[in-house]
Amino acid sequence: MYTDADRSREVVPEKDGHDKKWRDEFGRDYGRIIHSASFRRQQGKTQVFPSRESDFFRNRLTHSLEVAQIAQGIAERINYDYDKDLGGKIDPRLCATAGLVHDIGHPPFGHNGESALDKAMQRYGGFEGNAQTLRILTRLEKKLRYAEPLAGDDRAGLNLCHRTIAATLKYDNEIPAIRKAADGFVKGYYGSEKIIVDRVKASVLNGYVLGAEEKFCTIECSIMDLADDIAYSVYDLEDCFKVGFLSPAEMLASDDALLSAVAKRASKPMKRTVTINEIQAVFMEIFSEIIEQPAEDADSPLDGIVIEDDIAQQAKRDESLLTFAEAYRTSKVMSEDGYKRTEFSSELVHQFISGVELKAHKECPSLSQIYLPEKLMLRKEVLKQYTFVAAIYAPRVKLGEYRGYDLVTDIFKALMGDRGDLLMPADVRGRIRKAPNVSVKAREVCDFVAGMTDRYAMEFWARLNSDAAESMFKPI
């Protein structure tokens, strides 16, 4: 399943003075990620709800840990049920490593911060979270340097194995150096890392030539991507239940406008039209065990009352209201009972991992893919898209992100100014002053801003614009 080429690194040999023959190469990569500054910074980046609102809420770091665990579980499940289909076993820790780093390139303030930086960088190669992840791993982290500059840059990042880097490459596409506003958002990798991507692909493909319509995506990357979706659809919803932002009863009673928006978003990944009725059916199926249903022989609240014909309809309505009230009371348990929430989340994750299926690539097993069958895929997408539309797009959540767009834009403009380099740490300032052109300067500024946590970005902006800024003696 893995070759020496998969384990090859950009900088060889590594002169660290230690004989690590007893350590697995992918295990070394796992350790490098855990101890990296970029990995730690994820604790200061919001997942859905700002962590300052409650210690319970997930941040990018805890989300990544959950993705890593789910990815490892999927790999172990595939190894157990499909041990003869791949010509070897998948390395579970390699999949976990991909989970740890999958969000490491996200800027402050989530997708609004991403949009702000991409707009600022449209004439300089763009900005995209996955591309930034690759750049952090292969350039920005301060582990090793090349003996001679590669594509004008001697930084080698964490010098990870090629197969580890491949596990993070979700989009096999170079982002154009210059784009117009009408071109829209492009996912992929930056031109500055193209030479590294080409080397990684050559190592992993090991002579196999991709077909005309075939994209480069390894089995580990496929596992990480699905693990991310599972964590997103389950645990973000759990956070919403905890804070009382959503409840099962509210989801079951969603209006058609909300359900239509969810159906529209779910239709694209499902590659077909998803209907409102399907969404409602998913909710009924998921929540049927949570909301207590009265037994068939249970007493009705209206038992013993003689119902005249002229009030029969009103009585039925009253009983429906009482039934709904019971459902609502029961569903409130999700925000008040941690045992029930944990049971709910664990069961969903178990269903998804247990349902994963493999599509083996006979010619190049490294490019094998995993997927969920139709029913589970729909369940995942409905939960994911509903949380996105109902919670993440809610005014209370979007207000902070909207403000973040302006903060990131203001900071970028200030740093790109004639004296912007004076506002940055010494090491970044040195690279800015040595930049051969404005495009390289913009990328250095973008790297600095993208690495900020939410709090650091707000403090930095306050220093530039507010009378109530942090102390001037606090380090930049």
Curated annotation (Swiss-Prot):
Domain of life: Bacteria
Domain HD span(s) in chain numbering: 60-233
Protein keywords: Hydrolase
InterPro entries: dGTP_triP_hydro_central_sf (IPR023293), dGTPase (IPR006261), dGTPase-like (IPR050135), dNTPase_2 (IPR023023), HD/PDEase_dom (IPR003607), HD_domain (IPR006674), PHydrolase_assoc_dom (IPR026875)
Keyword Hydrolase among record annotations: yes
GO biological process, one term: dGTP catabolic process
Pfam families: HD, HD_assoc
SUPFAM superfamilies assigned to the protein according to its UniProt record, in alphabetical order: HD-domain/PDEase-like
Record region (Disordered): 1-20
SMART domains membership: HDc (SM00471)
One Gene Ontology term of the molecular function aspect: dGTPase activity
Keyword Hydrolase recorded: yes
Alphabetized PANTHER family for the sequence: DEOXYGUANOSINETRIPHOSPHATE TRIPHOSPHOHYDROLASE (PTHR11373:SF32), DEOXYNUCLEOSIDE TRIPHOSPHATE TRIPHOSPHOHYDROLASE (PTHR11373)
Sequence similarity: Belongs to the dGTPase family. Type 2 subfamily.
This protein's name: Deoxyguanosinetriphosphate triphosphohydrolase-like protein 2
Species of provenance: Mesorhizobium japonicum (strain LMG 29417 / CECT 9101 / MAFF 303099)
